[in-house]
Structure formats: C-alpha cells, structure tokens
C-alpha cells in the first residue's frame, strides 16, 4: 500500500495553449505580467494571446518544425513567458538555460537537448554564439532578446526577436487527440538527477496542467492574489507558475529581472503583494534587509510564502514568520524537476513550525524503499522516497539508461531523498539526500561535472568533489579534494581553473583540500562517504 495525497480533482486533458487562451476567465485588458522596475511595461491576456499567435507564425516562417527545441537564454522579463508560449504554440519545445553559463556549459546543454534555435539576451551572446555555431545553429536562427532593438542590430548583426512578429498570426498547434496531451513534449528543462551531468527532462502538456491544478485549483484562497516573480525563469522551480499559471489565473505578477532585495521589498510593500515563492538564500537576504527601519514592515501584505529547492532550518523559518502579518503562512514545499516542481505542500491557511515539507498533493502517490530497492512503505519509516502521479514526468530525453535507473517498473521516480511520513499528521519530513548532488542557493551542482573539468588540469592527478555546508549562508558549496601531480599546485590556481570554465554557483567556494589519495572501491567508484569527516571542517 502506498501513501496517497488527500482528495481528488479532475485534471484537464488538453493542449496547454488552449487551456490558457480558449476562454478568458477574467478581464482581458487587465495587466498580468508587470515589470517591477518599470510598471508602465505590462502585458494583458489579450496582448499575450495576440503575441503568442504572432510568434507561432514567425517561428514557423523561420523554419521551426513540430518537436524542434528552442533555447531561451536570458534573465527574467515580462516577455520571457510570452516567448515560451509562442515556442509551444508553434509546435516547438522550450528549453531555458542559466544566464551565467559559460560557452562550455552552453555547448553541452544545446547538444544534449538537440536545440535548433536560440533566443538570447545580447549580454550573453559572446558565450552563446560559439556554443550555438558549434552545434550547427546558424546566425539566422539566433535572435536577440532585448528592448533595445536598434542597438542589437548595430552591435551584433542579429535580428531582434520582434522580427518574429512580422508574419501575421497563426493558430497554435492544437492536439487532435486529447490523450496526446500526455505524450506531447512542450518543455525540456534540466535536472542534475541523482548522478552525473545535468539531464534534459521532458515535460508534457498534461504534466504542467496537472501541476497547476493540484497546487492552485485544489487549494483556492479566499482573497485576491498578486504575486512577485523573482526566481530565475529558466529554472523548474519557477517555470510552471511563471509561464503558465500566471495567465491562467490572471493574478497581477510583478517580474524582477533577477532577485534584488531592495526592489523585492519595495515592490511587495508598494503593490500589496500577497504571495511569493522563495529559496533559502532569498529568505536570508530579506531577513538581513528587514533589520533596517526602512523595510521592517515591508512584508505585511504577504499572506502566503512558500520556500523550496533546499531545506530551511526551523529557527530561520520562525524568524521570517515573525516579519509577516498574523494571518500569513510561511511553509516549506518539496519537489524536483522530475515532479514538475511541487510534490508536497501545506495549503493556506494551515501553518507549520515543525520543519515539514507538507503533505502529498492530491493524486500523488509515494512509497519508501530501502538501500536494496525493497518496498518498506509504512508510516514513520525512513528510506528513499519515490513518487508517482500526474506531475511526474515520463523521463529524460534520449537517455534510456538514466530512465531505467531513475524510474521503476511501476512508474515511480526514485528521488534520491531520504525521508518519512508522520503517521499521525501525514506530513513529510526529509532527513538527508541519498544523491551526491550539491545544492548551492537552490541551484543543483553535479560533482561529476566539476570533477570532469578538474581532471583536465595538467597538474591534477585525481579529484573528488563534495558539498560542504556553510551554516551562516544556509547553503552548500562545492569543495574539491585534489591529488596533485605537482606539489607546487596551490589552492587559488585550482579555484581559478574552475571559475574560468563553469558558472559562478559551481565554483569551489567550499575550498580545496590536497590529499594523498582519493578513496575508491574495486570498480573505481569514489567512496565519498570516507570524505565525510573531512567534509565537516568549518569553511
């Protein structure tokens, strides 16, 4: 017998663009996406629908065919989600990449996702163009995504993304069979998985509609909602709510290009924001800023705050709760890319101060297995949590071996997280992670990727990368254990080698430790558990 989410709710089985645009559920001229730094920039439902139809026509005119993958490489913007919807409307598959990626990382993501087109912020084109060209993407399939059209043409020679709007309008790709909603891919987002390099995860129409239905429709709130969107739009933690739920619900959504504490707090206070989703580093930044009189009451309008992507200790949770109004809730959620984001939550108006990540969403199932993979599902029993349900994806793109190891014969996804379900409250608690993935400020870092880079250093003989926890910053950082080929090699040289090749959050901020040997088993696998004692050293 498996654990099951309480209640049930019908999940629409249709294409996601029709789900959003076939029928308006609110005033169609009402601003939905609003630029937090310049509120005169906004997009309504009517404007969004027209833009999406124009993009569908423009992308098809540019040669996009059904199933082609389009990479969107940018910071947040009110038009970001419009481009996502336009890609899907044209029959394409959206993928997002981190603006901080190097050319090396972009090359990998474009290649593995089999991207055919790119839309990029001009600030990152110096890294994107070499990666795109290396994957056979010509410049006439790369568009610049910015508000400064003339500057783009003059400095890059690339077409501005608005050139895609000059081909009239076309209807979106509608599904001739509703069941195709469960098999047709609309987004290809990356997850580190349990081991190895980031993996492309395929989301269907049904996965995303199910995520919205189980989070929002199953738990309506008794007040008018407004949201602030500050998590990076390329990330699975933000994508479902930012790109799809916003226009379905019609709630005003204030978009930050990236998280900035001052703008965040000013926006919440000025526009009476009622709901936000955050990660622990954002919570810590807000706590720091709210010690000043200027911002001490900035969060009083918030009624729902959810924190996910990494654990948050109960003390920090209580400190943040004290900044909110008495009727506000601050709770933790749990999920992953493979579950289309949220899998467990505590719905409003219930609160929690126990450190729980909540209960399973309606329609979701969970079981617990031991280290041998045996089912040991029972209340208050700790083991690896496995998930099954409408939000759980079908698998990774073009990675059959990864799918075989991550999904069992019954369709359960092995999360790699150790936890248990309280027999009385049905709340879930996560104790540790089975997987080696390092979580840095909510972003996932695959040790194998950093190790792969370091192994290319001419003076490094062997290396292992693990996560070390910084109690002050409330996050993990990568640390490298290095066997030197040359004893003159210094820590800063190793750090710089990684910094030049990987994104900032993958850098060795946990330090470098030089050792005589890396512990391995007979098959050559690194025995990272033997580095546990060293890992506890203070940063």
Swiss-Prot record:
Name of the protein in question: Phenylacetyl-CoA ligase epaB
Database matches in CDD domains: Firefly_Luc_like (cd05911)
Residue numbers binding AMP: 188-199
Residue ranges of the region described as AMP-binding: 449-525
InterPro entries assigned to the protein according to its UniProt record, in alphabetical order: AMP-bd_C, AMP-bd_C_sf, AMP-dep_synth/lig_dom, ANL_N_sf
Keywords for this protein: ATP-binding, Ligase, Nucleotide-binding
E.C. code: 6.2.1.-
Pathway note: Secondary metabolite biosynthesis
Root EC class: ligase
SUPFAM superfamilies noted in UniProt: Acetyl-CoA synthetase-like
Pfam families referenced in this protein's UniProt entry, alphabetically: AMP-binding, AMP-binding_C
Function: Phenylacetyl-CoA ligase; part of the gene cluster that mediates the biosynthesis of nigerpyrone and its derivatives carbonarone A and pestalamide A. The biosynthesis pathway begins with the polyketide assembly by epaA to form phenylacetyl triketide precursor from successive condensation of two malonyl-CoA, presumably with one phenylacetyl-CoA starter unit produced by the phenylacetyl-CoA ligase epaB. For the nigerpyrone biosynthesis, the reactive polyketide chain is released as an aldehyde through the R-domain. A nonenzymatic cyclization and dehydration may create nigerpyrone.
GO terms under biological process: secondary metabolic process
Any GO MF annotation of the entry: ATP binding
Taxonomic source organism: Aspergillus niger (strain ATCC MYA-4892 / CBS 513.88 / FGSC A1513)
Family indicated by similarity: Belongs to the ATP-dependent AMP-binding enzyme family.
């Amino acid at each position: 017998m498996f654990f099951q989410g309480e209640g049930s709710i019908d999940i629409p089985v249709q294409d996601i663009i029709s789900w959003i645009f076939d029928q308006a559920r609110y005033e169609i001229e009402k601003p939905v996406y609003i630029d937090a730094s310049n509120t005169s920039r906004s997009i309504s439902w009517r404007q969004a629908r027209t833009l999406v139809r124009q993009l569908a026509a423009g992308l098809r005119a540019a040669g996009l065919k059904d199933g082609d993958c389009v990479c969107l490489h940018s910071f947040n913007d009110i038009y970001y989600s419009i481009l996502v919807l336009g890609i899907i409307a044209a029959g394409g598959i959206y993928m997002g990449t981190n603006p901080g990626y190097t050319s090396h990382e972009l090359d990998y993501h474009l290649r593995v996702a089999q991207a055919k087109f790119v839309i990029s912020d001009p600030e990152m084109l110096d890294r994107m163009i070499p990666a795109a060209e290396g994957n056979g993407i010509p410049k006439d399939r790369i568009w610049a995504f910015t508000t400064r059209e003339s500057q783009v043409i003059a400095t890059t020679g690339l077409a501005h993304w608005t050139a895609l709007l000059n081909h009239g309008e076309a209807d979106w790709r509608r599904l001739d069979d509703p069941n195709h909603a469960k098999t047709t891919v609309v987004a290809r987002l990356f997850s580190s998985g349990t081991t190895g390099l980031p993996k492309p995860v395929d989301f269907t129409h049904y996965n995303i509609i199910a995520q919205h239905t189980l989070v929002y429709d199953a738990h309506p709130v008794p007040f008018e909602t407004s949201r602030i969107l500050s998590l990076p739009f390329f990330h699975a933690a933000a994508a479902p709510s930012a790109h799809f739920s916003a226009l379905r619900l019609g709630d005003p959504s204030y978009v930050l290009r990236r998280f900035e504490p001052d703008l965040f707090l000013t926006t919440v206070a000025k526009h009476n924001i009622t709901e936000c989703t955050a990660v622990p580093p954002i919570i810590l930044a807000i706590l720091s800023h709210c010690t000043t009189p200027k911002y001490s009451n900035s969060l009083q309008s918030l009624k729902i705050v959810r924190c996910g992507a990494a654990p948050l200790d109960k003390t920090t949770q209580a400190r943040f709760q004290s900044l909110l109004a008495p009727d506000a809730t601050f709770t933790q959620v749990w999920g992953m890319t493979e579950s289309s984001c949220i899998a467990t939550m505590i719905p409003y108006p219930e609160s929690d101060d126990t450190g729980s990540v909540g209960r399973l969403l309606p329609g979701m199932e969970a079981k617990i297995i031991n280290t041998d993979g045996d089912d040991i599902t029972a209340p208050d029993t700790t083991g690896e949590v496995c998930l099954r349900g409408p939000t759980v994806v079908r698998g990774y793109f073009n990675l059959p071996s990864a799918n075989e190891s991550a999904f069992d014969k019954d369709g359960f996804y092995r999360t790699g997280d150790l936890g248990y379900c309280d027999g009385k409250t049905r709340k879930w608690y996560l104790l540790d992670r089975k997987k080696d993935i390092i979580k840095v400020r909510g972003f996932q870092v695959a040790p194998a990727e950093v190790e792969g880079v370091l192994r290319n250093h001419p003076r490094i003989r062997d290396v292992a990368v693990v996560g070390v926890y910084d109690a002050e910053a409330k996050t993990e950082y990568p640390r490298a254990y290095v066997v030197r080929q040359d004893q003159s090699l210094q820590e800063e040289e190793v750090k710089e080698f990684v910094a030049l090749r990987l994104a900032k959050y993958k850098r060795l901020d946990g330090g470098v430790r030089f050792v005589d040997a890396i512990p391995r088993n007979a098959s050559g696998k690194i025995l990272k558990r033997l580095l546990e004692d060293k890992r506890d050293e203070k940063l």
